[in-house]
Amino acid sequence: MALVSISPLASKSCLRKSLISSIHEHKPPYRTIPNLGMRRRGKSVTPSMSISLATAAPDDGVQRRIGDYHSNIWDDDFIQSLSTPYGEPSYQERAERLIVEVKKIFNSMYLDDGRLMSSFNDLMQRLWIVDSVERLGIARHFKNEITSALDYVFRYWEENGIGCGRDSIVTDLNSTALGFRTLRLHGYTVSPEVLKAFQDQNGQFVCSPGQTEGEIRSVLNLYRASLIAFPGEKVMEEAEIFSTRYLKEALQKIPVSALSQEIKFVMEYGWHTNLPRLEARNYIDTLEKDTSAWLNKNAGKKLLELAKLEFNIFNSLQQKELQYLLRWWKESDLPKLTFARHRHVEFYTLASCIAIDPKHSAFRLGFAKMCHLVTVLDDIYDTFGTIDELELFTSAIKRWNSSEIEHLPEYMKCVYMVVFETVNELTREAEKTQGRNTLNYVRKAWEAYFDSYMEEAKWISNGYLPMFEEYHENGKVSSAYRVATLQPILTLNAWLPDYILKGIDFPSRFNDLASSFLRLRGDTRCYKADRDRGEEASCISCYMKDNPGSTEEDALNHINAMVNDIIKELNWELLRSNDNIPMLAKKHAFDITRALHHLYIYRDGFSVANKETKKLVMETLLESMLF
């Protein structure tokens, strides 16, 4: 990566080292995990986290099922030793000066006397800089400037699209596709019918032969636009099909370059599996390698420098929050539950990849804690606990009294107390922003969640396979989307009285869609491993029960189609303007579905966290950007 001078700070040698190499030159931050097909605890298992039998403790004599999950892969000493100079005031001061300079670049699109700049490419200039600051993860500093720029573009928006400039005679695909995407994401009323201007009489998108770089970028922006589709938008489906095919063909012909890297990233992560911090990391690399993509050379340099500084400054905050989370985890006694998945580092990484504003610390930590708790609870209810123990635990948690632990098995006592104390802690945190005690509201969500888990535990115990609808309705609740999301959302600086909160929480359409999405997508990635552990019920098996003669492939095709439809409905729920839900809360709730979807791109990234998930942690949490 090229060096970028940020004098006077560039003299510091720390700027030229990655975080990993500067802290532990020879010791990796993670442990090497043996192949999951190894023999463990004296039992032979299959390569996909199969069922194994063990006792809860040497003296309880109870035979139990366990999911043979790999242990926490991250080295505690390494995490506690993390350190970076980017928390020092000098870096923040430099970033603040750069923010002022970038604002001047926004404002320079108007002349000093208020007249407009050249009409040659004034629309595309505005779209480019707005798109760039958003992809670089620094848009929060330029809210007013972004609004002014997009108001200007919208003023010249026509039914057949726009050209590069306000006086352009001919509309072009690049400006129109990028404009449509950006305006829609910011709540402007724009119709996808505008894309029909670039189709022929047969509905095929028209492109000039040769696949020039400019044309490829146009189709790339068409692809990005097509992913922000609402239900029933046929032209968006056609745009996605065309652009997907076109870009795949282009990748076979163009050389390896920053453009090909950008195409691969966009096609791999799209919209609904993309994460703001991961995109910032990738787009910094892309812009640095390909200055030809800069419409404004001065702006490009300033944006890159600011984005790198912001990435590394936030990294210093991530380290402190992760170190706090590690202490919470160790003090909770949860590490003693060796049968459970311990993924606190991974969950914090997800939280910090979507909540990239430094002031949302309570959200990041709350989400990481909630996700870790529901993962441990999932392992207790699905595999380790006996039906009698689970009934005891469910009854005790509903009474919400710490004295209830006296009636529980030893291994459940610490779990009960961590749930009890963490929910109460987040209730106090939420009271700071909401001005009221939300515990009773939150407890109802947890009670429904435990009831759904208890129902599934009975299915496993009785060998019962429900019909698809019964399984799906219960599975929405047991997906844990609601309990993982509710309290973190309440810590945001967004006023959410109960009547507004119910617009994104239960029983809202938004919550139903998000919970359904997580259940369906999770099952398509986990059903084989779950079946090997003795959990027969899944969306796949229940669909096949409802449809005798159908195959697993039939079931997967049906469920994948449901998932694609849900994503479009979630897009609509996020961007529709006729509700009174603060966008801050709605966007974070939406981004949680993106974060969880990201872990399911290739496999169950919760359970198998030593592959793609490890790469995400390294790139967005443990490695800083080089200058």
UniProtKB/Swiss-Prot annotation:
It comes from Abies grandis. Pathway: Terpene metabolism; oleoresin biosynthesis. CDD domains: Terpene_cyclase_plant_C1. Its EC number is 4.2.3.15. Mg(2+) 2 binds at D378, D382. One of its GO terms (cellular component) is chloroplast. Induction: By wounding. This is Myrcene synthase, chloroplastic. Its main location: plastid. Mg(2+) 1 binds at D378, D382. It comes from the Eukaryota. The gene is ag2. Mg(2+) 3 binds at D530. It holds the Pfam family Terpene_synth. Its cofactor is Mg(2+); Mn(2+); K(+). Coiled coil: none annotated. A motif (DDXXD motif) lies at residues 378-382. The Asp-Asp-Xaa-Xaa-Asp/Glu (DDXXD/E) motif is important for the catalytic activity, presumably through binding to Mg(2+). Residues 1-52 form a transit peptide. GO terms for molecular function: magnesium ion binding; myrcene synthase activity. The lineage of its organism: Eukaryota, Viridiplantae, Streptophyta, Embryophyta, Tracheophyta. One of its GO terms (biological process) is diterpenoid biosynthetic process. Keywords: Chloroplast, Lyase, Magnesium, Manganese, Metal-binding, Plastid, Transit peptide.
